[in-house]
């Protein structure tokens, strides 16, 4: 990985953290520590290693992101929005009734598998 790629990933991780904290703050509910702690890993997966396609989210050969730390899902939601899988404004609906984005990963969002 080049220095430029490393800097770009650090910037993505910072953006994930900002968006996760913003989502949790707006929802007035959640655990920011979990999302903050997985931001570097999530950024590396979604923006460097994983083969995914927002134009074809059910692509058979796509990589899967396994998140076993449920409280950290705001970081994953932010990554999905930043990659173009969900509209950015959907992040403002975290934990609201009827939202596909809940405090733990749930199948209301078609990209989440449990």
What name fits each language-model region?
Residues 31, 113:
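Histidine-centered divalent metal-coordination motifs
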Residues 1-16:
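N-terminal hydrophobic or amphipathic helices/low-complexity stretches enriched
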Residues 9, 20-23, 36-112:
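Cofactor-binding active-site loop characterized by glycine-rich and histidine/acidic residues
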Residues 15-16, 33, 37:
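N-terminal glycine-rich anion-binding loops that anchor highly charged ligand groups
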Residues 13-29:
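N-terminal capping segment at the start of a domain
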